[in-house]
């Protein structure tokens, strides 16, 4: 379902914990991190789509989260042609998204990345609200920045946008094995046999 301009209606989810840290998911078999997101099906409201995507991609249900805020309007990004399937090139331009800020009221162990046959993420972690976005695929960075900025007004304590240092992004990309011994792990993964 595309709008007249070629944008697919979509929802994006910024999930925070009680420390205002943001949930990041690592894309399956990739080295990029992103927030949960997904298309709005015909007849769904953005809120219904958000809850469906949250359960499909993260394994959390409505009782695990509280809606803190949402963007006032659609935020758009265009997808480069080489990422678009040949059969829809010329019609499809990108995504237009309503972004939701959710506070997790459940527990970390409620997260289940294997709710579907084809999971989106193979690892996840909490990270500071403001983090360098170079771990996000380039064409989504601007919309992420705009969503984080707009929704930051809903945070329970003010967070000041301090330009992050480069080592913060490296930490987000580090795997469990590459951590320093005294550094706590915040990455959540499941063993392959589950």
From Swiss-Prot:
Q: What are its cofactors? A: a divalent metal cation
Residues of the region (Disordered) are: 158-194
Q: Name one GO molecular function term.
A: mRNA 5'-diphosphatase activity
Family matches, as InterPro entries? Nudix_hydrolase (IPR020476), NUDIX_hydrolase-like_dom_sf (IPR015797), NUDIX_hydrolase_CS (IPR020084), NUDIX_hydrolase_dom (IPR000086), RppH (IPR022927)
Biased composition, class Basic and acidic residues, residue ranges? 179-194
Q: Which keywords does UniProt give here?
A: Hydrolase
Q: What is its EC number?
A: 3.6.1.-
Top enzyme class, one word, equals hydrolase
Question: Which domain of life does the protein's organism represent?
Answer: Bacteria
Which family does the similarity line name?
Belongs to the Nudix hydrolase family. RppH subfamily.
Query: What is the protein's name according to its record?
Result: RNA pyrophosphohydrolase
Give the source species: Janthinobacterium sp. (strain Marseille) (Minibacterium massiliensis)
